[in-house]
Amino acid sequence: NNSEIVKEEQAAHDEWLRWRKEFLAEQELPTEYSQLSDSQKTSVKAIYEMIMYLQDKYGIEFEYTGYVRPQILEDEYLTAIPKGGNEKTDTVTVTRQDDGTLTDDYPNVVVRPFYEQMITDYIEDYFGSDQFKVYATVSSSTMQSIIDNSESIKVNDIGTSTVIFIDNDICSKHEINQLTNSCLLYTSPSPRDSTSS
């Protein structure tokens, strides 16, 4: 029905106008779109497109934290955090590929706390102590990692960099080396996981 299409288009346009005015005010830019340079207009449109991509894909609100226009040796990308998130641990990057498609790393952000908790539980069981802290950066994961949630996540489905701070009182250097080897075995795929069917 044409009237429904027109209503949807009007609603989308109204949302764009509302978002744009709010965004420009937050960035301390002129809220009158006509006062922006062509470059600023292009960037604002791209930022809106990327934020809406995230919100439509994941069904939650995201807050803008940064944007880089395409350059000779760098892809165009946006950084954002889930509303109320922590910029240090929850930053999501949306990248525009050469063919114009958008990709993101939100699954890595979602999986990180589950992964950190798995490693924390493992070390607590290993030493019988909670005198340590685990920090992880997840560089790759799958949507299946999110769908499966913390109950059934497979550590080897995730690419991470993990740092563990341990109180000197709970272990010796030798025990730390043993823990390192044990963690490597725990987080590495077993031979049966890597066989193809």
Task: Place the predicted regions along the sequence by residue.
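Exposed beta-strand-loop-beta-strand "reactive/processing" segments of non-cytosolic proteins
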Residues: 56-96
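Short helix-loop boundary/capping segments
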Residues: 148-182
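Short, non-transmembrane alpha-helical segments in secretory-pathway proteins
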Residues: 19-65, 115-124
